[in-house]
């Protein structure tokens, strides 16, 4: 940034979640530096905020080993071209948003050319493949972390990291409108309601749906009028779930929802869900939950040896204890899942204590992440 040249920020986002983060960051930066220039790899939201797209985000948004191998030559070409063009542009800061397999190498290339680099959204190095932290430390000037335990991990290895809070915590109210969500879904205010969230990936829906449905059948024995809502991320997952339900629980009445996962969580007294971001969202929705997860035996055997954390769900990692019941692999079976959910549906002391802790954790990570990220970029640009 000079008198002749405005603040110039280069960014690369590789998927929709990164596009959302990038758009929020650009918006916050423009409020402070209205004439700033933004260039790089951007999706529609970042472009709407004024980012000049040298490549469309979809070019990087490939999933799975086969798809990546099929596009590898193109991906390597894009990274080499960005290394060259950013090197010539000399932006004040480069921000790689998530997409670590693509961005961390690019960050390292740019740092060698004297360009300041930020990696926005920490990979799960604290959980597995921890030695990646050394590569990240060499490639970046700063990591922006959503969660406090991530910063503690980087501090241990002397890698500069800033905890900025979580954008999802900023977006969700501390006190959700449960009755409002029930009105949207057509659930009576006085009904007991359970949300089933068997995951967003095909393999998760295949492995978990039958046990989740059998669990709901058991719970109906105690709560005959139990309302069951099942949000599914897209038509493919809905079709998959309907096929499994027809085989396992054809007579079980449920509300199938297209998307609307957040509304389902807010409306429900309890949720049974796969681990992942959904558990964090459920915590922020203040919905008591049980995490059930199952994978293929060899994958689980491998995961047990690679994963270095005591818990798998983000609420437990944030709390530093088993706040939420985790039933994994052989433990993920209907009798045990139902037994863990019953006290939550009763809306007693267990639920209220969990709700209070969820609210405390929400406050801890509600830090206006867009503003915090913008401040970090400007400080590094000076």
Swiss-Prot record:
Positions the record marks as coiled coil are none
Q: In which pathway does it act?
A: Glycolipid biosynthesis; lipid IV(A) biosynthesis; lipid IV(A) from (3R)-3-hydroxytetradecanoyl-[acyl-carrier-protein] and UDP-N-acetyl-alpha-D-glucosamine: step 5/6
EC number per UniProt: 2.4.1.182
Keyword Lyase listed? The answer is: no
Q: Which domain of life is it from?
A: Bacteria
An example of a Gene Ontology cellular component annotation for this protein is: membrane
Q: Which UniProt keywords apply?
A: Glycosyltransferase, Lipid A biosynthesis, Lipid biosynthesis, Lipid metabolism, Transferase
Which GO molecular function, any one, fits this protein according to its record? phospholipid binding
Q: Which reaction does it catalyse?
A: 2-N,3-O-bis[(3R)-3-hydroxytetradecanoyl]-alpha-D-glucosaminyl 1-phosphate + UDP-2-N,3-O-bis[(3R)-3-hydroxytetradecanoyl]-alpha-D-glucosamine = lipid A disaccharide (E. coli) + UDP + H(+); a lipid X + a UDP-2-N,3-O-bis[(3R)-3-hydroxyacyl]-alpha-D-glucosamine = a lipid A disaccharide + UDP + H(+)
Q: Which GO terms describe its biological process?
A: lipid A biosynthetic process
User: What protein family is recorded?
Assistant: Belongs to the LpxB family.
What this chain does, per the record?
Condensation of UDP-2,3-diacylglucosamine and 2,3-diacylglucosamine-1-phosphate to form lipid A disaccharide, a precursor of lipid A, a phosphorylated glycolipid that anchors the lipopolysaccharide to the outer membrane of the cell.
Q: Which PANTHER family match?
A: LIPID-A-DISACCHARIDE SYNTHASE, LIPID-A-DISACCHARIDE SYNTHASE, MITOCHONDRIAL-RELATED
The record's listing under NCBIfam families reads: lpxB
State what protein this is by name: Lipid-A-disaccharide synthase
Q: Which organism is it from?
A: Escherichia coli O7:K1 (strain IAI39 / ExPEC)
Supply the source organism's classification: Bacteria, Pseudomonadati, Pseudomonadota, Gammaproteobacteria, Enterobacterales
Q: Which gene encodes it?
A: lpxB
């Amino acid at each position: 940034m000079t008198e002749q040249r405005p603040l110039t920020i280069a960014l690369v986002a590789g998927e929709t979640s990164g596009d959302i983060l990038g758009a929020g960051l650009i918006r916050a930066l423009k409020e402070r530096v209205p004439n700033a220039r933004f260039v790089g790899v951007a999706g529609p939201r970042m472009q709407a905020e004024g980012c000049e797209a040298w490549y469309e985000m979809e070019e990087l948004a490939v999933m799975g080993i086969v798809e990546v191998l099929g596009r590898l030559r193109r991906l390597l070409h894009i990274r080499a071209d960005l290394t060259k063009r950013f090197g010539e542009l000399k932006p004040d800061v480069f921000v790689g948003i998530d997409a670590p397999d693509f961005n961390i190498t690019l960050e390292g290339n740019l740092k060698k050319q004297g360009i300041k680099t930020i990696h926005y959204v920490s990979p799960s190095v604290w959980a597995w493949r921890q030695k990646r932290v050394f590569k990240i430390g060499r490639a970046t000037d700063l990591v922006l972390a959503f969660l406090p335990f991530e910063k503690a991990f980087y501090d241990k290895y002397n890698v500069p990291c800033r905890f900025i809070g979580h954008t999802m915590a900023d977006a969700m109210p501390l006190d959700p409108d449960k009755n409002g969500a029930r009105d949207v879904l057509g659930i009576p205010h006085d009904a007991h309601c359970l949300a089933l969230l068997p995951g967003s990936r095909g393999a998760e829906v295949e492995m978990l749906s039958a046990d989740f449905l059998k669990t709901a059948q058991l719970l109906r024995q105690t709560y005959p009028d139990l309302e069951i809502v099942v949000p599914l991320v897209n038509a493919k997952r809905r079709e998959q779930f309907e096929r499994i339900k027809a085989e396992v629980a054809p007579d079980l009445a449920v509300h199938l929802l297209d998307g609307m996962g957040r509304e389902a969580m807010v409306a429900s007294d309890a949720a049974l869900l796969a681990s992942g971001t959904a558990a964090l969202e459920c915590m922020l929705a203040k919905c008591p939950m049980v995490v059930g997860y199952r994978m293929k035996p060899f994958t689980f055997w491998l995961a047990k040896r690679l994963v270095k954390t005591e818990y798998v769900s983000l609420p437990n990692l944030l709390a530093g204890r088993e706040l939420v019941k985790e039933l994994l692999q052989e433990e993920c079976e209907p009798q045990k899942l139902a037994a863990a959910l019953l006290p939550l549906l009763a809306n007693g002391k267990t639920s209220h204590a969990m709700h209070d802790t969820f609210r405390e954790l929400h406050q801890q990570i509600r830090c206006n992440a867009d503003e915090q990220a913008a401040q970090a970029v400007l400080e590094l640009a000076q």
